[in-house]
Each structure stands twice: as C-alpha cells, then as structure tokens.
Design a protein with these regions (language model features):
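Short, Lys/Arg-rich, polar N-terminal cytosolic tail immediately upstream
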Residues: 1-28
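A structural signal for multi-pass alpha-helical bundles of membrane permease subunits
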Residues: 28-327
Length: 327
C-alpha cells in the first residue's frame, strides 16, 4: 500500500518532516504573536455571538416552551415553516420585503459608485472634503432621528415639503401626506435610506480608485482622452472587481430588510405596505412572547436560507461570467 502511494504521488512525508513543519509553524506564530493576540477578541466575538447561537436553531423545529427547555420541548419538524408559508400574510410580507430590497439595491448601489467616480474627478480638495463630509454625516444619525426628520419635513401642514409644493404649485395647493400614504411608503423608505448611507457606501470605491497609477491618467491625457473616456476605460475597470464583490455581498441580504425603520414609519394608512418579514418576526417573537418564539425562529431561519441561496447563486454566476467571486 505504501509503495503504491509512493508510486502515485512520488512523495512521502516522514516523521522528521512533520516535526520540522510543526516547529516552523510555532516559530511563525511566536514571531508574529502580536497579530495572533489581536485575533483573540474578534474570534471570541464570532464564537460567542455567531456560532454559539446556532445551537438555538433547533427551536425552529420544536414547539418551544421555557419550562421544558430547548431539548425538552416537543419536536414538530417543519410545521412552523409550513404554517408561515401557508399563512394569508406570507405573500404580502414576501412581496413588500423583496420590493424594498430590490428597489434599494437598484438605486443605492449604482449611485454610490457614481458618487465615488464623481469625487475622484474633483481636483479642488476643499470642495471635495466638504462634499464628503456632507454625504457621510447622515450615516451616523440614528434611525429614530432620521424618521423624526422625515415626519417633520413631510408634514402636510407645516413641513418643508409643504412650502416647496406651494412654491411651485401656488399657495393653497393640495399637499400629499407622504408619511400617511401607503403607496408612498416604498419611495420614502428607500430614498431616505439612500440619503443616509450614500456617502458612507461610496468610501470603499473611493479607496479602490486611490490605487490607480497616476501614470495611466497622464498617458491618457497625453493621448487626448476626455475625462469621460478616462473614467470609462481606467476608473471603472479598476473598481469593477470591488463592485462585483460588493454586489455579491449585498445579494446575501436580499430579505434582510431591518425592522426598526419600518416599525417607526408604520401607521394604519401604510400597514399594508410596511409589513415586512422582519417586522413580522419582531411582532411574533417579542410582542407575543414565548408562545410564538418557535414560529419567529423558523421564519428567521427561512430568511437566512433564502439569503444563502441568493449569495451562492450570484457568486456562481459571477464566477462563470467573470473572474471575481467570494469563493
């Protein structure tokens, strides 16, 4: 058997070689012990908050009650998944979540790339810094502040939006209540999120553009290339791998629309449009107590499975048509 292995591979690792490899690994760890020490906290964080909670996934397949514990609760299989998919509200939740997610992706993703390309063109550093500061600051506002600002701005009686409408349509013109109009929920939700995160999302593309060799710009200018052609043939190809990777990552959150903002914007007028999977999980798992805890866990697991399928599919497609992929 050993001779066949040697004949096939042409190489057999001896005991001395294994000891030497282990010694070499210890030397590398000892040489860079500071870096390995810095890894302790992030690894501990992942183990504690990402991997350890996976033990609780079994709640999705049980009729969980606190008195019985996770392992003692009755096993019901995929019953909670079936109940959710067959519920009357399922397709409304799924539709609203998909619409907001795709709407946000199609609008915010290209706009952040465009902003990065435009800022890269600006040569006046003071103006560039002012624009960056103005676009970055909203990202650090809490959701509560953002929604509060929206209610003040779009107030049909005394908001800024009212004055803008009257400026163009005349005083006394009818002002729509955007925060109380169901059909407007998608637009107000998505565009307020774009305003809040546009600058911050462009940072990674600005960083990628900083790696472009300045000699390429000089050569293109000598050849008489316009600024648009430079952007088309130098800037975009440079950040294209970054764009693909970020798109793949975003596809893994296709159903992960946060519940906080939707709940704060939610009212009786837009409830049909603002009910998302995340808000439903919040109401089932936290507002109704342990009675619906298993159902909420099952819905969250369903959400994660769909997200994984999306990110895997997009990654495989990217791998076939291009060179960039996550794995």
């Amino acid at each position: 058997m050993v001779n066949n292995s040697v004949a096939t591979t042409g190489f057999v690792e001896t005991k001395e070689m294994r000891i030497k490899r282990r010694t070499s690994l210890r030397k590398q760890v000892f040489k860079s012990w500071q870096l390995y020490l810095m890894l302790i906290l992030p690894v501990a964080y992942l183990l504690l908050f990402s991997y350890y909670p996976m033990y609780g996934i079994q709640i999705a397949f049980r009729d969980y009650t606190p008195s019985m514990g996770m392992t003692g609760s009755e096993w019901v299989g995929i019953q909670h998944f079936v109940n959710f998919v067959n519920s009357q509200i399922f397709w409304d939740l799924f539709k609203n979540t998909i619409i907001i997610s795709l709407y946000s992706l199609l609008c915010s993703f290209p706009l952040s790339v465009v902003l990065a390309l435009c800022l890269n063109v600006v040569r006046v550093e003071k103006f560039k810094k002012v624009v960056q500061t103005v676009t970055y600051i909203p990202h650090f506002f809490s959701i509560v502040i953002i929604v509060g600002m929206m209610f003040q701005i779009f107030n049909p009686h005394m908001g800024i939006f009212k004055h803008v409408v009257e400026l163009f349509a005349g005083e006394g013109a009818a002002v729509p209540d955007l925060m109380g109009k169901g059909e407007a929920f998608y637009h107000t939700y998505v565009w307020s999120a774009i305003w809040q995160n546009l600058g911050f999302n462009s940072i990674i593309y600005i960083a990628a553009l900083s790696s472009v060799d300045t000699e390429l710009y000089e050569s293109a200018q000598i050849d008489g290339a316009s600024r648009f052609k430079i952007m088309l043939h130098i800037d975009i190809p440079t950040i294209l791998p970054t764009i693909v990777i970020m798109l793949i990552l975003r596809s893994g959150h296709i159903l992960s629309v946060g519940y906080e903002k939707a709940l704060l914007m939610q009212n009786d007028a837009n409830i049909k449009y603002s009910q998302l999977i995340s808000t439903y999980v919040y109401n089932e798992g936290l507002m109704k107590g342990f009675k619906q805890y298993s159902s909420a866990t099952a819905i969250n697991l369903f959400n994660s499975i769909i997200n994984f399928i999306c990110i895997w599919s997009v990654n495989q497609f990217s791998k076939k048509v291009g060179e960039s992929s996550l794995w």
